[in-house]
Amino acid sequence: MISSNDFRTGTSIEIDGAVWRVVEFLHVKPGKGSAFVRTKLKSVKNGSVVEKTFRAGEMLPQALLEKSSLQHTYMEGDDYVFMDMSSYEETRLTAAQIGDSRKYLKEGMEVNVVSWNDTPLEVELPNSVVLEIKETDPGVKGDTATGGTKPAILETGAQVMVPLFLSIGEKIKVDTRNDSYLGREN
């Protein structure tokens, strides 16, 4: 059990048999009446976001999520297959379960799979990944006086904005949290 006073961003709670993650929270102490906690909760299962208000100090069941490090081995139809490298046990996730993470997912990549009651819920990518540029416009010398950017499509199909000097075939480091270019990779 966890008190609504102890909510932090990322806290997982269980409401009506579903797992929700706290995205935003605000402790409100009105001049008249009792204090309460206003939250935005994101469903771990389907990604929907709802606003919910709890009384201050209200006790809720905390969802105990398990993280396991798995390697993405291959795709079979629309399913992504992951393998536990110590037990060689396979776990399958659908494209809907993976969500936006799939734009950075490539075979052989190690990721954390979050499970609840032995049911895989979502994939947590590393904060940055190294990917190859597959498509981008050529950068012309003297295009801008200051650093400009152009769109580039990476080997996984993700699109990020990169500096003008980069060309097709170069490997770059990308931040998976905000889709930003971090630098060149050798």
UniProtKB/Swiss-Prot annotation:
GO BP term, pick one: peptide biosynthetic process
Family assignment from sequence similarity: Belongs to the elongation factor P family.
Domain of life: Bacteria
GO molecular function: translation elongation factor activity
Name of the featured protein: Elongation factor P
Subcellular localization(s) per the UniProt record: Cytoplasm
GO cellular component: cytoplasm
CDD domains: S1_EF-P_repeat_1 (cd04470), S1_EF-P_repeat_2 (cd05794)
Pathway assigned in UniProt: Protein biosynthesis; polypeptide chain elongation
Main location: cytoplasm
Gene it is expressed from: efp
Pfam family, one: Elong-fact-P_C
Role, per record: Involved in peptide bond synthesis. Stimulates efficient translation and peptide-bond synthesis on native or reconstituted 70S ribosomes in vitro. Probably functions indirectly by altering the affinity of the ribosome for aminoacyl-tRNA, thus increasing their reactivity as acceptors for peptidyl transferase.
InterPro entries associated with the record: Elong-fact-P_C (IPR015365), NA-bd_OB-fold (IPR012340), Rib_uL2_dom2 (IPR014722), Transl_elong_fac_P/YeiP (IPR020599), Transl_elong_KOW-like (IPR013185), Transl_elong_P/YeiP_cen (IPR001059), Transl_elong_P/YeiP_CS (IPR013852), Transl_elongation_fac_P (IPR011768)
Alphabetical UniProt keywords: Cytoplasm, Elongation factor, Protein biosynthesis
